[in-house]
């Protein structure tokens, strides 16, 4: 028996006299339940695998003494009493003496294990009491098993109020739950477990019946505090005052010091000397050209009737003028600048004639399959024709296009869609806007589709003079249909613009 005692002491088991008492054998069903409840992957090789294969002789009592006790019934099941399964009877040899009622175990006290609980992950670690609880009374393995199981301390209170039951996740050094369920005395429902939840260790197995802890506070989305409506608004810097600076004011006032009748007269004289020779001695070559009268400079006003040509004449002699523009780029650049200035100062009838001139020139080029060149003086000044017509017809077209259910003038010129063409007015502005856009973009050559002409087609839908005749017609028609007196006056003044009323005074303090 001395040998058995030494072996038990060396194993580090804290056994009392009650562990060696003779108890009835443990049922197999209770043992299986106990093994399932402790199946966390942690087992002690020092006490569960020491079965002696030689029968009843030898250290057989060590196996029975170290065998895990049966987990008691769960106290949370109502109506099921907490019973203890009797321990199996210790088997003894025929020559072994009976243990005394008061043996040496009751006087030795607790034996300090040879290794720390942290280093021992087996049954030694599981037998340690929770660090937050007081040391239980020495009552053998049954008392400690009762404290570890679900029927431990606090089970009676848990039966009285199951709603106040809260899981305890205090870990023992062996990474086992210290207690199954416990109650927080006086704590409200659900508050006991919220303050004691601990997450499972990284990489370790998740224990059944233990709730996961909520994520840390730093990972939660925290809304900013609401702004106090009574708090003063942040100060904003006042924008800089929009004024004329002092230097510019001095420059404006200094004009009076330089302005004089003599200087104004000298300015008119110098300008008149430049205009008779705009090409600077390098005009278009006009020898033996049918276009010689218009290629050279002219001192008098332009008379459209003296420059009238038929469509057949334009078709016959148009290519020679086209080649003149293409073969003299410097003269063509000068002619383009001069034409732009002239077109922006034309009256309404002259502006309509310029629109017809541009479209008829494009039709002639298409007729002879000539490229539409943006450097051409006629095609390159389309924007001037468009701007002048839009300025003169804008007051009238606001009423006319709205009455016809068409797009506004600005929208027609910005969209530049062939599908928006519904009459002669929309045709003129859309086609001129498309040509001006291509010239502004600086394309090398304008395709015929810009004017709505398909492949292999001619510009048969346009007849020279349609711009002037068509726009004068709609002015007269709408003036009779519209009941607005303002619209009638506007349309009449566009067609026949003699001065009747409008200017009130002329003020000049300088000369």
Curated annotation (Swiss-Prot):
Region span, Interaction with host ALYREF: 104-112
Q: Which GO terms describe its biological process?
A: regulation of DNA-templated transcription; symbiont-mediated activation of host NF-kappaB cascade; symbiont-mediated perturbation of host cell cycle G1/S transition checkpoint; symbiont-mediated suppression of host gene expression; symbiont-mediated suppression of host mRNA processing
Q: Which residues carry this modification: Phosphoserine?
A: 16, 18, 114
Binding residues for Zn(2+): 399, 478, 482, 487
PTM text: Methylated within the RGG box possibly by host PRMT1. When hypomethylated, ICP27 is exported to the cytoplasm earlier and more rapidly. Phosphorylated.
Q: Where is this motif: Nuclear export signal?
A: 5-17
Residues with the Omega-N-methylarginine modification: 148
- Residues in CHC2-type zinc fingers run 399-487
Which Pfam families does the UniProt record give? Answer: Herpes_UL69 (PF05459), HHV-1_VABD (PF16852)
Keyword GTP-binding on this protein? Answer: no
Specify residue ranges for compositional bias: Pro residues: 213-232
Which GO CC annotations does the UniProt entry carry?
Answer: host cell cytoplasm; host cell nucleus
Subunit text: Interacts with host RBP1; this interaction facilitates the RNA polymerase recruitment to viral transcription sites. Interacts (via the RGG box) with host ALYREF/THOC4; this interaction recruits ALYREF to viral replication compartments and probably directs viral mRNA to the TAP/NFX1 pathway. Interacts (via the RGG box) with host SRPK1; this interaction relocalizes SRPK1 to the nucleus and seems to alter its activity. Interacts with ICP4; this interaction modulates ICP4 DNA-binding activity. Interacts with host NXF1; this interaction allows efficient export of HSV-1 early and late transcripts.
Family, similarity comment: Belongs to the HHV-1 ICP27 protein family.
Record protein name field: mRNA export factor
Organism from which the protein derives? Human herpesvirus 1 (strain HFEM)
